[in-house]
Amino acid sequence: NPWIESENSRAYHTFGEVCEKYHQYITKLFDDGIYREETYVGYVSYLRNLQAWNDSRRVPITYIYQFDNFVCSEFLDHVYIDRKNSVQTRNNYLTFLGVFSSFLVQHQYMKTKPCEGLQRIGKSLIKKERTIIDPSDMERLRDYLLEHNKHYLLACYLLHYVLIRPKEISMLKIKDINLCKQTITITAVVSKNKKTAVVTLPEKVIHLMLDLEIFKYPGDDYIFSRGFKPGSVFVESKQFRDYWTRTLRKELKFPNSYKFYSLKDTGITEM
């Protein structure tokens, strides 16, 4: 069509086509180590939800040029009001829309960012939810894991006492532990802030490691592979959350507010 060719022809790519191009783009960024797994998984989820929402509209947009400020605003209202999500979730979606908008401009699908002018809800209005696990529940957790899953207990110890993030825990290897110095190294590749850190391990963590005989495994093995035991196969940190949700919450009758990450928020107590 000569009328389309005279304008920006990229603006007439379909919304679905451009979303697929963006999916391929962020997948390459993840494969090249630019995006962390958590970021990549989040963006893929946001993109999928955006497409599903558009498909559900009475008059969905067809071409990418139709993805304008009004559509972005309506989508954020859907996330925050219709789906009854938190302010933080709404802000996270706005961040995603900003990144997606930058992609659209940089790749000449649009001349301006469609989400420009949309504001985050101020952080001062957000009360960060932190759930502290009751000391008696911490004891029940410890007792249950001592009997049923001591390897998972080690992961709990690293999160609770050493304050290592779940993603970092999943990437730790046997060789990162210095038994003589009783330290563990969080390498720059693993660390969230991209800086290497050496952290002292409490004696009870060392004792549990010795009890589990993890030092009999090759140094290049991950501390938490399949079944939370040392092995050569990398397993995503999702396995920690899944076990907490599907097993511990059921067996110990923990409230939904208790999450694996709550161990990091909970003050140092006897576990």
Protein language model annotation of sequence segments:
Residues 85, 193-198, 231-233:
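Short, mixed charged/polar active-site loops
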Residues 2-9, 23-38, 47-129, 143-144:
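N-terminal core-binding DNA-recognition domain of tyrosine recombinases/integrases
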Residues 202-255:
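Active-site/catalytic core of tyrosine-dependent DNA strand-transfer enzymes
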Residues 7, 117-124, 189, 222-230:
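Short linear capping/connector segments at secondary-structure termini
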Residues 120, 162, 171-211:
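Conserved tyrosine-mediated DNA breakage-rejoining catalytic core shared by Y-recombinases
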Residues 79, 158-159, 172, 270-271:
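Short alpha-helical segment immediately N-terminal to, or the first helix within
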Residues 91-93, 106, 110, 116-166, ...:
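Basic, Lys/Arg- and aromatic-enriched nucleic-acid-binding interface segment
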